[in-house]
Amino acid sequence: MNKALPQAIFLMGPTASGKTDLAIQLRKRFPVELISVDSALIYKGMDIGTAKPNETELLQAPHRLIDILDPAESYSVAEFRRDALKEMEDIVAQGKIPLLVGGTMLYYKALLEGLSPLPAADADIRAQIEQEAETLGWEAMHDQLKEIDPVSAERIHPNDPQRLSRALEVFRISGKTLTELTQVKGDALPYQVHQFAIAPKERAEIHRRIELRFDNMMKGGFEEEVRSLYERDDLHADLPSIRCVGYRQMWEYFDGEGTLDDAIFRGICATRQLAKRQITWLRSWKDLTWLDSDNIDGALQTISDRLDKKQAQ
């Protein structure tokens, strides 16, 4: 590892594991600036259901890449990488260490490994695709994508014309599918990265925390928050923002699917599944140091020792 490279810290972990609390403590003790690595916290007006840091927490530890988009907008992994690299560069220029905190593992992976260079947008091809969609409908365009790139078609909904159009455009420009191109790694992250994951030792503790968080969300006005989104004319259930756990289940409730208690139960179950996927991903992560959610002092000491060791080299 080249010690001339600037340092960066990754603080990963499943939902409800205590990442924000630990990050705030780190901000108090070290010259770090926080960057959110969370595909839900990017959205404005989605505060309660995403467990977004509150005003007091943000005063103690400002987070970059929070509240940058309207829920009607999409945000790609490539856009996150571009924005995060820009923020990291700015933090390093201030003589500080970027602390990236969140649970969107795909974002971390893209940062570490880079992304394959995709062809630039072509206005003529994009216009051609949009013209076809006007004639045939986006469902038919999605069927086209299924034929050429079933993996991308599985991820991209017919009601997401921005991403659907881009996937078709990439194929028509390059002759290669989005799936093929994204399997090619790009430029690696030019930083010395200290990678940590925080989680309780017992799975039951994660489940308890998730249930407690959901209960607090409901008491804090989560139903009203989702209702205000539901009443907008420009949002629908297939947008990435509304597919976030908790929001999807409440949206279904407003659509007449089951009772409020059903929605809460489904939301808790979906959040548990998310945490399980995050932990599974982290268990296969290389060069990762695990921290115990129930021992914050020990976690702080572990990170401090790592930083002190690097500074002494």
Swiss-Prot record:
The record marks T104, R126 as: Interaction with substrate tRNA. One of its GO terms (biological process) is tRNA modification. Its EC number is 2.5.1.75. Its cofactor is Mg(2+). Substrate binds at T15, A16, S17, G18, K19, T20. Residues 38-41, 162-166, 243-248, 276-283 are annotated as: Interaction with substrate tRNA. Monomer. This is tRNA dimethylallyltransferase.
